[in-house]
Design a protein with these regions (language model features):
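N-terminal Sec-pathway targeting helices
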Residues: 1-15
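Membrane/wall-proximal cationic-aromatic binding patches
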Residues: 14-79, 86-97
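Short hydrophobic segments within beta-strands
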Residues: 54-55, 112, 236
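Membrane-embedded segments
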Residues: 59-145
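Residue-level recognition of beta-strand->loop/alpha-helix junctions
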Residues: 83-85, 237, 270-272
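Secreted/periplasmic serine-hydrolase-like ester/acetyl group-modifying domain
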Residues: 113, 126-229
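Active-site segments of SGNH/GDSL-like serine hydrolases
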Residues: 220-247
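C-terminal regions of proteins
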Residues: 248-309
């Protein structure tokens, strides 16, 4: 492949990726929990209930908003629960739409933190000899450096998110209480099968929990902004069947969150290892969605009820 063709491919992919990235970020930036769409018969929320937002990545999307809201309705509690989980979410990404979340005026925000979000991003720099002897590698290296931030913002299928944005304008968030990820029933995969399939793919990653970490800085800014706007924040660690970090780093992560809990006076709950012996998993990263896997939803509801007293 000559350099002219390689450069053309590079420019084309970059432009398309940027367009998709902007369009998909737009959905997060304009989200309105009271919006029902241009073609919907429901133009507004009839009831003035206090809003509860659940934030996090796909590791929290299986928390069932319908079950939580059913509990609130049957117990005559004036709350409405929204699962705003988004693919590949992290504090660094979520802070970009933070002001829009605040403008929706939630009473409570529950934030599920994925330990993997705080891993060290490593990329070995090319030496001068490599650049001189293999200029194509340098070009590809720069391409990777440009593309990675774009990938971080693309939550899965660009086609799906583009359609989701169009549906948002016409019909409002679908489903209304679970707007950013498709919510559908998934089957349980036996733990033995999951571990068998992942035994050669597990790579232990180091965490960066220093004050210089962009994820840590973003998390602290999120905490500060919610406190400034009198929004109650509850943190919890999102569950995974297989954690790709060492036990020492896992312990350090817990200690760091406990430090923030004391420093900012916010509750923290640890669920990251809570379900590792339960047959409730779709894969190594996600709890399945069906009537036999509701323990995750039940625990989030229990946390809410404790913190709402």
């Amino acid at each position: 492949m000559n350099f002219t063709l390689l450069f053309s491919v590079f420019v084309t992919i970059s432009l398309v990726s940027i367009i998709f990235s902007v369009s998909m970020s737009l959905y997060l930036d304009i989200y309105d929990s009271d919006w029902y769409g241009l073609l919907s018969k429901n133009n507004t929320n009839v009831y003035s209930q206090e809003k509860i937002f659940l934030l996090g990545s796909s590791t929290v999307y299986s928390v069932n908003s319908t079950l939580v809201n059913y509990h609130f309705i049957t117990n005559e509690m004036n709350y409405e629960f929204f699962n705003l989980a988004d693919m590949s979410d992290s504090p660094k990404k979520r802070i970009l739409s933070l002001q829009n979340i605040i403008s929706n005026e939630p009473k409570i925000v529950v934030y599920g933190l994925d330990i993997g979000n705080f891993r060290i991003e490593t990329q070995d720099p090319l030496s001068l000899n490599d650049i001189l002897l293999h200029p194509k590698n340098f070009f590809l290296y720069q391409f990777e450096d440009i593309m990675q931030p774009i990938r971080d913002k693309i939550p899965g299928s660009p086609k799906d998110r583009t359609l989701l944005t169009a549906k948002y304008f016409l019909f409002g968030p679908q489903p209304h209480h679970h707007p950013f990820l498709n919510f559908y029933e998934t089957s349980v995969t036996p733990i033995s099968e999951i571990k068998n399939n992942n035994q050669f793919d597990i790579e232990i990653q180091k965490l960066d929990l220093s004050e210089n970490s962009k994820q840590v800085t973003s998390l602290k800014n999120i905490i500060t902004e919610f406190k400034k706007n009198n929004i109650k924040l509850i943190l919890f660690t999102a569950p995974k069947l297989i954690q790709e970090v060492s036990d020492d780093d896992k312990q350090l992560f817990e200690q760091t969150l406990m430090y923030y809990s004391n420093e900012y006076d916010i509750p923290v709950y640890f669920l990251h290892d809570r379900y590792v012996d339960m047959e409730i998993w779709r894969d190594s990263q996600h709890v399945a969605i069906n009537s036999n896997t509701q323990v995750y939803t039940d625990d989030i509801l229990e946390i809410l009820l404790m913190e709402m007293k």
